[in-house]
């Protein structure tokens, strides 16, 4: 009888651990124009990890000289990844939204570690904020984000980006092509 209780307890503990492990992920709630009462697009983003506390980072709008370089640091660790050319014009960003009501959230789905471009300069967090600084619409953000990883490489595992503006919402999944291979599959 004790053996059966012990097995049940072990199975219960394993189930709880598995459930908790799966809960450590990001969550996006997405509502399109045709699904909201007033025709708004709605996106909520929560980082279900212990390390993110909802800081509202501010990137002011600006005009930049041609050839200006900016440092890129990995979002999660702060590790220096390299430099990229700054856009001539950038837009005001607070948190995960810019002055044109463009918003970008993410959900990590991981993937095979050998697909991370370990020589890449752009990680998922930098990609979000560069997209917001350089884009007015969701479609433009998709173009900017994919061009950046094509030029500089994608230094992250699999991500699902939620990209929304007042008119439409897109979900773009992205995963690298491997070490030293620029671009991403999206």
Model region roles, listed by residue range:
Residues 1-11:
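Bacterial N-terminal signal peptides that target proteins for export
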Residues 26-124, 144-186:
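A contiguous strand-loop segment
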Residues 14-15, 130:
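Generic anion/oxyanion-binding catalytic loop in active/binding sites
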Residues 9-14, 160:
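Intrinsically disordered and other compositionally biased segments
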Residues 17-25:
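Sec/Tat signal peptide C-region and signal peptidase I cleavage site
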Residues 116-117, 126-135:
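Second-shell loop/turn segments in exported
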């Amino acid at each position: 009888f004790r053996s059966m209780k012990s097995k049940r307890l072990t199975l219960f503990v394993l189930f709880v651990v598995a459930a908790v492990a799966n809960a450590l992920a990001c969550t996006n709630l997405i509502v399109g124009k045709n699904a909201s009462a007033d025709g708004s697009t709605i996106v909520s983003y929560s980082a279900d990890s212990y390390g993110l506390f909802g800081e509202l980072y501010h990137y002011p709008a600006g005009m930049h000289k041609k050839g200006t370089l900016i440092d890129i640091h990995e979002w999660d660790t702060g590790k220096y990844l390299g430099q990229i050319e700054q856009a001539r014009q950038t837009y005001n960003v607070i948190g995960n939204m810019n002055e044109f009501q463009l918003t970008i959230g993410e959900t990590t789905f991981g993937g095979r570690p050998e697909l991370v471009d370990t020589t890449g300069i752009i990680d998922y967090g930098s990609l979000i904020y560069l997209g917001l600084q350089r884009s007015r619409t969701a479609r433009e953000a998709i173009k900017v984000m994919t061009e950046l990883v094509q030029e500089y490489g994608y230094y992250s595992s699999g991500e699902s980006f939620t990209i929304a503006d007042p008119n439409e919402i897109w979900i773009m999944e992205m995963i690298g092509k491997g070490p030293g291979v620029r671009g991403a599959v999206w």
